[in-house]
Amino acid sequence: MTTTSSGGHPLTFTNGEHTLAGTFQPGAATGTAPPGTAALLVSGSGPVDRNSDAKQLATAVMAQVAERLAAAGVSSLRYDKRGVGESTGDFHAAGLYDNIEDARAALAALRAQGGVDPDRVFVIGHSEGAIIATELAAADDRLAGVVLVAGSAATGEQVLREQAVAVAESLPRPVTWLLRLLRKDIATLQEKRLATLRASTGDVMRMQLVKVNARWMREFLDHDPSPSLEAIRVPVLAVAGTKDIQAAPHHTERIGELAAGLVTIELIQDMTHLLRHEPGPATVRTYKQQAKQPVLPDVLDLIATFCTTPAAHT
């Protein structure tokens, strides 16, 4: 996994006994952002590093966001998740609320950087990162704004149920025919898996020989971001893709209804959960091919504009 990119330098910070490693990328002096503007970048779910890269799928989402922000004059901090890359700890043993506290520590570290105006800091989250960004924004009216990309406005259990239906609908007909022949239904299999996870008590468990972050799953299933969305008083940019089958666009529309601050909603046609363009049917089966493409300039430009517009700082 890549840990740095052009123009950035390593930065470490602590949360309790854990040391998290990241990259601080200064904004270009030629950018249009007000002096001292900065953003904390929080990646999505899974064992991903500061660039949003996992061993099985390198999406480089946050690396590309950081580069676009830097060009606009916005500094940023992105970091490896606990137990991933150069960060200490055990990824599988960490819960959702551990990840939230790690992000809170990252926000404090960013505000402490030289040249960063503590009152001109944004939080930008993608997928799980959007859930985390919601929690930070709900508790911090000092933020200049928050960006929620592929966010959620329902419990994790509801989101996963929607995902199961969407994935089943995206399968080729021969596969769905075979599943019916074998009397296997994806939604039913999902329910059984969730029941097993709910019955667990440890931080980690194995399901079909695969190590699973059970505590994170239990916390995610029960977590409802709605009360925190209602508590947000800072400007919000919520972005969704019409081809996202992991975070349905209706969640972003609901975010607009719940958040108390100034909210901008953007739905990008044919954008997937990986923030790539997909002209064909929405499916996770093309993720590896999608990851070879760059993140859509549309979403990068929306984020950069939001972070450099004076109205977002009021």
Which residues does each predicted region cover?
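Accessory cap/linker subdomain of secreted extracellular hydrolases
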Residues: 147-219, 226
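Conserved alpha/beta-hydrolase "acid-adjacent" motif
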Residues: 245-251
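Catalytic active-site module of serine/aspartate enzymes centered on a nucleophile-bearing elbow/loop
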Residues: 271-275, 279-314
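Short, surface-exposed "cap/lid" segments of acyl-processing enzymes
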Residues: 29-68
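Short beta-strand/loop motif that positions the catalytic acidic residue
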Residues: 232, 238-240
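N-terminal cap/lid segment of alpha/beta-hydrolase-fold proteins
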Residues: 1-37
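Primarily recognizes the serine-hydrolase "nucleophile elbow" in alpha/beta-hydrolase
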Residues: 105-115, 119-174
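Alpha/beta-hydrolase active-site loop
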Residues: 61, 93-113
